[in-house]
Amino acid sequence: MAAVDDLQFEEFGDGATLLAANPDATTINIEDPSVSFKHQPRPPGSLGREEDEELLGTNDSDETELLAGQKKSSPFWTFEYYQTFFDVDTYQVFDRIKGSLLPVPGKNFVRLYIRSNPDLYGPFWICATLVFAIAISGNLSNFLIHLGEKTYHYVPEFQKVSIAATVIYAYAWLVPLALWGFLLWRNSKVMNIVSYSFLEIVCVYGYSLFIYIPTAVLWIIPQRVIRWVLVTIALGISGSVLAMTFWPAVREDNRRVALATIVTIMLLHVLLSVGCLAYFFDAPEMDHLPAAITTPNQTVAAAKSS
């Protein structure tokens, strides 16, 4: 334990006394304007170089390299390896959702928002929300269309949840897997300037599906024209994100191959959108048909009994 005298304050003498004790000491006049300090204190409220780089986004490369190194530090069979793909904050997720809803012409979604730091948190929950939005909206749509009809008996179609989940998750994972394999194969033949990892492609496809969540809710409106207008708008927004993202990856390839790749991407996207609309919302209600078919038999039986 320290002595009591060691814990007391000690008063130092003035500068003259100190210089007399050590005449060889180096002195600097802080009021001299010709003297510059290497580490000057910043005034309150000012930003340093690191804060400026963070606001301007100039230190993204260092951060992405650090994140990439963290992901490679753990083996792929460990939980910590996959945990890094869900390590995103709310701001990053909202920023990527905003980028998928408001695509910037001529801008690459991966380079602008993902920055070599793909996440699976957004795509997973976007697909899950879309599955329930389509299934619930499809049931409500059929109910509202036949509301008030005496021969209609509403039966909840829970199988639509499993069907929607199979379709959405298969599209969000299998199509990126096939596209990644194709781009990897073409990159071995033609040295492309832009290349994407599998998780970056999954991230792009996952966030591009967000526009269909409000679209599926609005599909409840029992007007076929409104539904097709909504699906056209959703296709235009999400399709432009996919086209502007993957065109730089194939434009250095053969012209026909590049165009065929983009056309295939868009056709699969159209097939998903139109297929969901046609199956979950425009499909005929089978529970309504038997009542209409048995009506003539009931009329004949009533005539015979009379």
Swiss-Prot record:
Broad class of the protein's primary localization: Golgi
Protein name: Protein YIPF1
Glycosylated residues, chain numbering: 297
Signal peptide span: none
Lumenal side: 141-162, 222-227, 278-306
GO cellular component annotations of the record: Golgi apparatus; Golgi medial cisterna; Golgi trans cisterna; late endosome membrane; trans-Golgi network
Pfam families: Yip1
Topology in membrane: Multi-pass membrane protein
Record organism: Rattus norvegicus
Cell compartment(s), UniProt: Golgi apparatus, cis-Golgi network membrane; Golgi apparatus, trans-Golgi network membrane; Late endosome membrane
Intervals, Cytoplasmic compartment: 1-119, 184-200, 249-256
Binding partners and assembly: Interacts with YIPF6; this interaction may stabilize YIPF1. May also form a ternary complex with YIPF2 and YIPF6.
UniProt-annotated stretches for the region Disordered: 33-59
Domain of life: Eukaryota
Any GO BP: vesicle-mediated transport
